[in-house]
Regions:
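Carbohydrate transferase catalytic cores enriched for Leloir-type hexosyltransferases
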Residues: 1-378
């Protein structure tokens, strides 16, 4: 089988879609040496992403950094590469695909946030998504997604038959492990002035409910006076004025720290040393940090919204993400009731066994095998 994969998010500093692409693509190549793989990049790439002798890698012009260049890359460069290589199937793990390619296509859709919450996206990118994403959903021969919530959402929102959509849950990457108490103390000394801390990781953006989280933390500090900090790891995204305002108005500003991008070697340690992960996002397709927290034996406070209850199971304290009071009460519950927090950890040890990159990769491979067609030679 000749499998072409869109690997443009395999960048030097892996984030989000890059990690997803890495975890799936490396397993496909390693577990199926009998198959040939074509990795399609949109710029120069690192050799570590060529996972084996059965992988051919191409950098296609242009670097797809803008909606007009996305169109050029997917509708001109990609179809030509697929045709010349004789691909039997094209897999796109980032919710984009080529409408002009004559090859059977499978894509992963992680969520429909661009359709449901377009106000959080720059204007031109928003228009691109609103026009093309519905077309992509109907063009794909099969759609993979990362939760049953998103599967149902695609069917309802885009009118795609459920038989064309299947779920392959994300897994947790290697390195997320519990720490010994002395190691936790080292992390707290480095990042939190030696204090316990609540932790958030992800984009710093209003869609992630960061303004309410900051105000809820402020409430928690006022009510309890607890010697606890709030650490937020992640890049500042577009439209962060509301986040900045919430921070500037916080009475506990000295105990709130924006860490920016955290190296992949440090993120598991920050997660493992946290008092709890605070993940009260308004909209998610999976909520990977919750699974990472479960693997580090860290309690989770999560939003009772979208896919998060499905992924969290009984491993998280679920709260109303629109209520700052409810979030603050959740923080207080975890801070004051350590027996309850340990119960969340125990539940997380069981819940995390439901999610595996190995299982996800094999499901995706079976979908590709069923979808593959005669290589396009036209």
């Amino acid at each position: 089988m000749k499998i072409a994969i869109n690997t443009r998010f395999l960048l030097p500093d892996l984030e989000g879609l890059g990690w997803y692409t890495h975890e799936i693509a490396q397993r496909l190549a390693a577990r199926h040496p009998e198959d040939e793989f074509l990795f399609l990049f949109d710029r120069s790439f690192e050799g570590r992403f060529v996972y084996g002798p059965n992988v051919t890698a191409l950098a296609l012009f242009p670097p797809a950094r803008h909606p007009f260049l996305w169109w050029w890359w997917f509708e001109s460069s990609v179809p030509r590469a697929l045709r010349l290589w004789g691909a039997g199937v094209f897999f796109s793990p980032d919710s984009y695909l080529s409408l002009k390619a004559k090859v059977p296509t499978v894509m992963t859709v992680h969520d429909l946030a661009p359709l449901h919450r377009p106000e959080g996206i720059p204007w031109l990118i928003r228009k691109y998504y609103q026009y093309y994403l519905p077309k992509f959903l109907h063009r794909a021969d099969h759609i993979l997604t990362v939760s049953e919530y998103v599967r149902q959402d695609i069917a309802l929102t885009a009118g795609v038959d459920l038989s064309r959509i299947s779920v392959a849950y994300n897994g947790c990457r290697a390195g997320f492990l519990p720490l010994q108490n002395i190691e936790k103390e080292e992390v707290r000394n480095k990042y939190a002035d030696g204090k316990e801390y609540f932790f958030y990781t992800g984009a710093i953006h209003p869609r992630k409910n960061i303004p309410r989280l900051i105000r809820a933390f402020d409430q928690f500090k006022t009510r309890t006076g607890a010697p606890v900090q709030l650490l937020l790891a992640g890049r500042m995204a577009w439209q962060t004025g509301e986040v900045t305002t919430a921070y500037e108005q916080a009475r506990s500003q000295a105990d709130i720290h924006f860490l920016g991008y955290v190296p992949e070697s440090e993120l598991p340690r920050l997660m493992a040393a946290a008092l709890a992960l605070t993940y009260v996002s308004l909209s998610e397709g999976f909520g990977l940090p919750m699974l990472e927290a479960m693997h580090t034996d860290t309690p989770v406070l999560a939003a009772r919204a979208t896919c998060l209850p499905e992924i969290a199971g009984e491993a998280a304290l679920l709260v109303d993400p629109l209520s700052e009071t409810a979030i603050a009460q959740g923080l207080e519950k975890i801070w004051t009731d350590r027996t309850f927090a340990r119960t969340l950890v125990e539940n997380g040890r069981r819940q995390r066994e439901k999610f595996s990159w190995d299982v996800a990769a094999e499901h995706i491979y079976e979908v590709l095998k069923k979808t593959v067609g005669t290589p396009d030679q036209s």
